[in-house]
Swiss-Prot record:
Catalyzes the reversible cyclization of carbamoyl aspartate to dihydroorotate. GO terms for cellular component: cytosol. PANTHER family: DIHYDROOROTASE. The active site is at D247. GO terms for biological process: 'de novo' pyrimidine nucleobase biosynthetic process; 'de novo' UMP biosynthetic process. Zn(2+) 2 binds at K99, H136, H174. This is Dihydroorotase. The gene is pyrC. It catalyses: (S)-dihydroorotate + H2O = N-carbamoyl-L-aspartate + H(+).
């Protein structure tokens, strides 16, 4: 029986939702992760520092008594966002990043940015104070194929943004393509990139081959196998600009299993077990800690966690949690399509 002890990991891209779903899922992240960057795409979105403070209180109230989990709050960038409010939130220690959603790119992004020029005054302030911009990197131009939207975003939006504001610290969130990996590698230390658990495991065949599988549908959508392999190479490389952002995104099953299903994969309960499998498969268990526990804090200029966790590998496959109940309904947990042998020890 094999064990691996690492610093406690963090999740640099997490959806906890609100209300009954928040109550049902929060502990699944808190069980393994010390901190998480919390996405602000609620309805209505988390736009102001006051909104973020209130949401943080709701998250803390959803955790078990004595939980040490720390939600790291973000603001949703709109064309009417107030630079002074954002700076005040950052100076107070509450706000750790601002999230750019191109309008219509993903779940609850209708209030996002349609014209990047309109938010440059805010971006300039963020660059000045050192506040990171987390970017959902897809164009929403209907003429662009869904599988090309990340590459086109890099060309149309990210490259001009980098030229105009090279001092702005940017996180390319949930990169899904070799184009994204290569762009991140070509940039200086002001650019980092998160990679999700599921994009290391599935390609687009998982969604489309042999029938529609809605629980593998997410945005950005999984791409072809060559891109998945590029993501794996980046994640296991030890390169400091790549770090874990699970993009765990719960939706109730009826909202996934329908004619027009929601995008999102709920992987919080089994992420660390899945990642241990991936890194073991790649002969890179010695670099799992860098990806999950060291690179993200370094980019966000936070200390790594002092606490350690131990992962244990069992000879026989372990039973995996399949569903999380939310009242009379349920959320399906990500199925990696391989037997789970690793477990975070209590």
């Amino acid at each position: 029986m094999k064990t691996l002890t690492i610093r406690q990991p963090d999740d640099w891209h997490l959806h906890l939702r609100d209300g009954s779903v928040l109550q049902a899922v929060a502990e699944h992240s808190a069980a393994h992760f010390a901190r998480a960057i919390i996405m602000p795409n609620l309805v209505p979105p988390v736009v102001t520092t006051r909104d973020a403070a209130a949401y943080r209180e709701r998250i803390l109230a959803a955790l078990s008594e004595g939980s040490a989990f720390t939600p790291l709050m973000t603001l949703y960038l709109t064309e009417s966002s107030c630079a002074d409010d954002i700076e005040a939130g950052f100076r107070s220690g509450l706000i750790k990043a601002v999230k750019l959603y191109p309008a219509g790119a993903t779940t609850n992004s209708q209030s996002g940015v349609r014209n990047i020029e309109a938010v440059y005054p805010v971006l300039e302030r963020m660059a000045k104070i050192g506040l990171p911009l987390c970017v959902h990197g897809e164009v929403t131009d209907p003429a662009v194929d869904i599988f090309d939207r990340e590459a086109v975003f890099i060309e149309r939006v990210l490259q001009p943004l980098r030229r105009r504001l090279p001092e702005l610290r940017i996180v390319m969130e949930h990169v899904t393509t070799k184009d994204g990996v290569d762009f991140a590698l070509s940039q200086d230390e002001n650019v980092g990139a998160t990679i999700t658990t599921h994009h290391l495991i599935i390609n687009r065949n998982a969604i489309l081959a042999g029938g529609i599988r809605p629980h593998y549908y997410c945005l950005p959508v999984a791409k072809r196998e060559s891109h998945r392999l590029a993501l794996r190479a980046a994640a296991i490389s030890g390169e400091g600009r790549f770090f874990l952002g699970t993009d765990s995104a719960p939706h109730l099953d009826p909202l996934k299993e329908c004619a027009c299903g929601c995008a999102g994969v709920f992987n919080a309960p089994n992420t660390m077990a899945c990642l241990a499998h991936v890194f073991e498969e790649e002969g890179a268990l010695d670099r799992l800690e860098a990806f999950t526990s060291l690179n993200g804090p370094a980019f966000y200029r936070l200390p790594p966690n002092e606490k350690r966790i131990t992962l244990r590998r069992y000879d026989e496959p372990l039973e995996m949690e399949r569903k999380v109940s939310v009242g009379d309904e349920a959320i399906t947990v990500f199925d990696p399509m391989f037997p789970i042998h690793w477990k975070v020890e209590d």
